[in-house]
A protein has these predicted regions:
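Hydrophobic/small/kink-forming positions within alpha-helical transmembrane segments
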Residues: 46-50, 54, 77-81, 107, ...
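Membrane-interface helix termini and inter-helical loops of multi-pass transporters
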Residues: 1-5, 61, 65, 110-122, ...
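Hydrophobic alpha-helical transmembrane segments of multi-pass integral membrane proteins
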Residues: 7-25, 43, 94-104, 122-129, ...
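Hydrophobic transmembrane alpha-helices of multi-pass small-molecule transport proteins
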Residues: 23, 82, 91-113, 131, ...
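Specific transmembrane alpha-helical segments of multi-pass solute transporters/efflux pumps
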Residues: 24-72, 108, 191-209
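Helix-capping/transition residues at the boundaries of transmembrane alpha-helices
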Residues: 3-4, 60, 87, 145, ...
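A helix-boundary/kink motif common to multi-pass secondary transporters
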Residues: 7-8, 64, 87-91, 149-150, ...
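Helix-helix packing/entry segments at the starts of transmembrane helices
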Residues: 13-14, 53, 67-74, 140-163, ...
Length: 260
């Protein structure tokens, strides 16, 4: 709905800015994080917020919201691959198997769209880049959360994300305020619900079980993308998509079970 009034630059900025205000009101105390760590917080603000938020908003100009959510469900694959290849984190062979079956489920859900091959354009590519960006950010943020806590880490990362989104917005677009009639409620929902509450919950999960194990919860995103796409946007869900969703749920459960 927000795309009816706002462009991708504006959506990216407002959802980060609203989330930043919300989280900073939750914790008004001064955060003492060494300046040497701020480059990593800035990376998180860029790779977890400013860049993927813009990419997903831009992608949904040409693909359905359901398809964008389904592609987002591939994020755990990239988190695991990047953790294994770049950050040398170990996962068992059986966990690799469940990641593969989870990806298979996402594949089935994606190809359940009758027009998937037509949709596989620049929008799908941008959504895939956003998922890869999440993969790097999740691995970078894990030690920050361990050392400084989930709330403090998110608080500063959102500040950097808002700053970088504003820098990208000013030369490329204009500062149009969301209106009550069209985009204000969607932006409040994205800002408070997603950038605020959901990210804080996910950061706490990363603190408890790590980026790889915590990322398996992202497999739930395609489920709600399909459901909400059908309810609010009348996007079609086929039988093969339901089969794919079932595989995703089973894979997520088994992966978490083995991790525990």
């Amino acid at each position: 709905y927000a795309l009816e009034e706002l462009d991708p630059f504006q959506i990216s900025f407002y959802r980060i800015f609203i989330g930043m205000v919300f989280i900073n009101l939750l914790n008004i105390k001064k955060v003492n994080i060494p300046l040497s760590q701020h480059k990593y917080l800035a990376l998180v603000g860029t790779l977890w917020m400013a860049l993927p938020f813009f990419l997903f908003a831009k992608a949904e100009e040409t693909i359905s919201s359901s398809l964008a959510g389904l592609i987002n469900g591939s994020t755990p694959i990239f988190i695991s691959l990047i953790a294994y290849i770049v950050f040398k984190e170990k996962i068992s062979n059986i966990q690799k198997t469940y990641l593969i079956t989870g990806f298979l489920g996402i594949y089935l859900v994606s190809f359940g769209f009758n027009n998937f091959l037509l949709d596989l354009n620049l929008g799908a590519f941008l959504a895939l880049l956003a998922s890869i960006s999440y993969g790097f950010a999740a691995n970078i943020v894990q030690p920050l959360i361990k050392n400084y806590g989930s709330l403090n880490t998110l608080k500063i990362a959102l500040r950097y994300g808002a700053l970088f989104s504003l820098i990208a917005l000013l030369p490329s677009s204009s500062l149009v305020l969301p209106t009550v009639e069209i985009s204000l409620f969607p932006m409040l929902l994205l800002g408070i619900g997603s950038s605020g509450i959901a990210f804080l919950s996910f950061y706490k999960l990363i603190d408890d079980v790590g980026a790889v194990a915590g990322s398996i919860t992202v497999y739930i995103i395609p489920i709600f993308s399909v459901i909400f796409g059908y309810i609010f946007l009348e996007e079609y869900t086929s039988t093969i998509q339901m089969v794919g969703i079932f595989i995703v749920i089973i894979s997520a459960y088994q992966f978490s079970k083995k991790r525990n």
